[in-house]
Amino acid sequence: MSLDTVDKLVVFLAKRDGIDKLVKTFQYVAKLACWHVEATRPEAADRFKKWEVASGLSRKAFRTGRSLTGFNALRRNPGATPMIRFLAVLANSGEMVYFFFDHFLWLSRIGSIDAKLAKKMSFISAFGESFGYTFFIIIDCIFIKQRLKSLKKLQHSTDEPKEEIGAKISEIRGDIVMRLMGISANVADLLIALAEIHPNPFCNHTITLGISGLVSAWAGWYRNWPS
């Protein structure tokens, strides 16, 4: 029996990444809503701000232990070539720094440790995030280039039955789409991290942060949605 939309939603939300993307959507919708009404409806803006902050803190709690994900990825599947393995070490190391120091950022913001540490923890976490995601983007670009070459060969191949070629083409196209979604999410998160590392009018504008957050969340929805 195939899964319907409700079944898929239940499976999606059962995943830690699934609930994270839902709460991330709440966080950045609230950020944009707060910005939209802050001049005309300060009470509503305050409520949206509280929703944004609560969502952000909830996401940090959900990510407890996520620093082990990158370590396990390197341990189990470091990459097929020396170049990919090297890039994977850089990418996952950056992500591990991001998630590890994000734990301390969360603890400082809820008052469990010195609140003065929040700014330093936020900077280190954002630096690790931007470093790691830069290399994840490079890895995805390399794989997309390889997939496009394979796709071109298959489209001109006459050695296999059309059904098999069609299935392989569909699989390659699906992988390309997933990697494009990954690049979209990582670029969006990179902009958010840059706003913390090197504040500037573009990256720190509410519209930039809000749209980047939603792009990242919705790309994650697409990638984690059950097939």
Swiss-Prot record:
Keywords: Membrane, Peroxisome, Peroxisome biogenesis, Transmembrane, Transmembrane helix. Induction: In seedlings by transition from dark to light. Up-regulated during senescence. Signal peptide: none annotated. It comes from Arabidopsis thaliana. Homooligomer. Interacts with ARC5 and FIS1B on peroxisomes. Residues 107-201 are lumenal. One of its GO terms (cellular component) is peroxisome. GO terms for molecular function: identical protein binding. The keyword Repressor does not apply. Involved in peroxisomal proliferation. Promotes peroxisomal duplication, aggregation or elongation without fission. The chain crosses the membrane at residues 86-106, 202-222. It is a multi-pass membrane protein. It is found in: Peroxisome membrane. InterPro entries: PEX11. This is Peroxisomal membrane protein 11B. Residues 1-85, 223-227 are cytoplasmic. Belongs to the peroxin-11 family. One of its GO terms (biological process) is peroxisome organization. It comes from the Eukaryota. Pfam families: PEX11. Its main location: membrane. Expressed in roots, leaves and developing siliques.
